[in-house]
Amino acid sequence: MKRREVLPLIAGAAGIVAGAKVVAAEKSPAAPELRRVSYQSARTGKERDYFVYLPPGHAQKKDWPVMLFLHGDGERGDGKGELDYVLTHGPLFEAWCQNRDLPFIIISPQLPMFDRGNQPYIKMRTPASIPARRAEGINPRPNTVTGDVRLSEPMGGKSPDDRLPDGPRGLTQGWYEIEDELIAMVDRTVASFKGDPKRVCLTGLSYGGFGCWYLAAHHADKFAAVAPIVGYGHPDHAAPIAAAKLPLWVFAGGRDPVVPLRYFYPVLNRLEALGHPEVRFTNHEDLGHFTWVRVYEGEDLYAWFLRQSRA
């Protein structure tokens, strides 16, 4: 079933005007839907699309929790024919491609390519790498973390490295480039699809993990919880996050050669020094950069998100 509806989406500096098209849906009104929402990007000057996933039973209730997902460097694209690459990893892969019942509205935008199209992992990708949707849903997944993962002891002995290779904006040509557009997407999705503005969570992997820290620091009052995966923050991010008491669950891979573990500690130590009451840090010591596969496969991150709400 496919249909098109016009959503008046006008949002400040982002200058967004959008429509939404059902990409795919089952005939049952209780079935999940995947929609493409069009907007005019102020940053690129072109029309682009982003995905909005609506969970099973969406039409029967309101005040759904909302999740903004920021992908990694390898899923960049033109926001049109290349948008499907954002289905490759993360919560949208789990909810849509794996046909998994995740009770969130999921917003999944695509970062523009800018001049990073020559990266080997981008040049090597093909449409064949885009996963198809499973005909039948998967069984509930297990938790991936056990025990209390809140910071319980000083981390100064964890080999912190205060000489970070990146400034507060994170990696070059990252998600900060479309900051206003991302916030506009959240606001419009909440207004148009029965989202709960007090339960908007943020997560991302690699480049998206860096983007999570940036958005959390600059829009701490927007989110109920944030989970950056294999992306570290800058110590300058700590003060606004701590002031807002924004819950964080940070994930790293102990064998990650791309985003070294030692770079996570400066911001975590700063948050601890500021007395932030809700910081979790999980290091999957046996995993490398693809730590996000285990994290997003598990149930515990989603269960934690569902417990969070802004006052």
Predicted regions located by residue number:
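Active-site machinery of serine-nucleophile hydrolases
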Residues: E75-E179
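C-terminal catalytic histidine-bearing segment of alpha/beta-hydrolase fold enzymes
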Residues: F251, P257-A311
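Primarily recognizes the serine-hydrolase "nucleophile elbow" in alpha/beta-hydrolase
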Residues: K198-P240
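Catalytic His-Asp charge-relay segment
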Residues: K245-A252
